Amino acid sequence: MKLAYWMYAGPAHIGTLRIASSFKNVHAIMHAPLGDDYFNVMRSMLERERNFTPVTASIVDRNVLARGSQEKVVDNIVRKDQEERPDLIVLTPTCTSSILQEDLENFVARAQLDAQGDVILADVNHYRVNELQAGDRTLQQIVQFYINKARKKGDLATEKTPQPSVNIIGISTLGFHNNHDIRELKTLMAELGISVNLVIPDKASVHDLKKLPQAWFNLVPYRELGLPTAKYLEQEFDQPYVDITPMGVVETARCIRAIQGAINDQGATADYEAFIEEQTLHVSQAAWFSRSIDCQNLTGKKAIVFGDNTHAVAMTKILAREMGIHVVLAGTYCKYDADWFRQEVSEYCDEILISEDHGEIADAIARLEPAAIFGTQMERHVGKRLNIPCGVIAAPIHIQNFPIGYRPFVGYEGTNQIADLVYNSFTLGMEDHLLEIFGGHDTKEVITTTMSASSDLNWTTEAQGQLNKVPGFVRGKVKRNTEKYARAQGLSEISLEVLYAAKESVGA
């Protein structure tokens, strides 16, 4: 456990709660001290939910510490079972309450005697895994629980649907543009003549999970959520899965071809080549845009990409392959899946950074001085401090990246959205310079381009005035070069003479 003022992936219990609250009529009981129960507020605000978040905190207080938790936890489970009538109650501790080392399995067994619905304990090690890994494990656990339950009852639906069908696995609450992506994926499947059997966990009933084996194949659009579940279903029912994220023109085509292979292996005679060509050349604007003069203006411009594995890999490939943008650094905070990330992006970028430390990423951005950043909410903050534009492409995100309008990132409409995001993220031509010449509300003060809080150098008024005359898009570089020169000369003050000497030293 570590104290941090910014985390890319939250603690494990957040992942479990995201899965539980994504299902329909499932309630989560969180065994936690006050302070760990912020999930309800976060979800209600970010997802703009009309309904109450189905999560209850069973607070660990001094009475619990004195007498033990069993009575309180069991009472809370039974009370919620009677009040809400959920199909399933998931009990989860947090990393804080795990310190108590209580036998929560026993609490669940005791509560199950009085509860009408099912009760399970989230099988997650809260010290070893983060939000993404815990969500992945919880989804697999719930699917396994209901598959085994149906098997015992003898009503497991294993016969395939007459026409090709798919389970879409991994759409959850608080996911990056998930509610837009699922609409686009459903549209894409309909155009391919494939019916959607189930979408899990988003708005799915746990009683429908026994129908999962009926689909011809499983689609896992995000690497962070759903892969273990798909592998379990493949192992149990010989059900193939496609785990290619359909993001960008090239990867969407690759995903569709993989789907074609999966259903044709089971007796279908699908041929999607004409569909891919039609969408790529005429429906999606992205392929046309990438050959236009607007996009050619971006060729060779430097960009940094950072996010979760799915979005960072997809974005790196789109920028490098489809738009000719020079990716100087690609990074991820998913350290547990670092090998896959390296394998996917190594040929498309100069540097790879795998880190959960936002300061390390900020320093890399300041060092490399890209023309644009594509990252999370944190990289957006860094970009604002460094005066570098940033397009947000991955969670964690704030409210403005839960848009009300339709903004998918996957499929062919997703390619249009990404093209817009990329183009609008770069500062166009002399835009900044013109704004400064003509003044107005957009005039910017000089800001430092180092991520440290203070500088050991003082600028004289004359030198600062001269620096202000430098066009905005190179001013940061001039400032850094001058300060670097001053430090090398052992100076503590930067005057006009020092500024000119620094300029000469770099041959400008």
Swiss-Prot record:
Keywords assigned: 4Fe-4S, ATP-binding, Chlorophyll biosynthesis, Iron, Iron-sulfur, Metal-binding, Nucleotide-binding, Oxidoreductase, Photosynthesis
Pathway of action: Porphyrin-containing compound metabolism; chlorophyll biosynthesis (light-independent)
Binding-site positions, [4Fe-4S] cluster: 36
Any GO MF annotation of the entry: ATP binding
InterPro entries referenced in this protein's UniProt entry, alphabetically: ChlB/BchB/BchZ, LI-POR_suB-like_C, Nase/OxRdtase_comp1, P-CP_red_C, Protochl_reductB, Protochlorophyllide_Rdtase
Any one biological process term the GO annotation gives: photosynthesis, dark reaction
Broadest EC class assigned to this enzyme: oxidoreductase
Catalytic activity: chlorophyllide a + oxidized 2[4Fe-4S]-[ferredoxin] + 2 ADP + 2 phosphate = protochlorophyllide a + reduced 2[4Fe-4S]-[ferredoxin] + 2 ATP + 2 H2O
Cofactor: how and how many bound: Binds 1 [4Fe-4S] cluster per heterodimer. The cluster is bound at the heterodimer interface by residues from both subunits.
Cofactor: [4Fe-4S] cluster
EC numbers, comma separated: 1.3.7.7
Active site feature: 294
Top-level taxon of the source organism: Bacteria
Family (UniProt): Belongs to the ChlB/BchB/BchZ family.
Subunit structure: Protochlorophyllide reductase is composed of three subunits; ChlL, ChlN and ChlB. Forms a heterotetramer of two ChlB and two ChlN subunits.
Name used for this protein in its record: Light-independent protochlorophyllide reductase subunit B
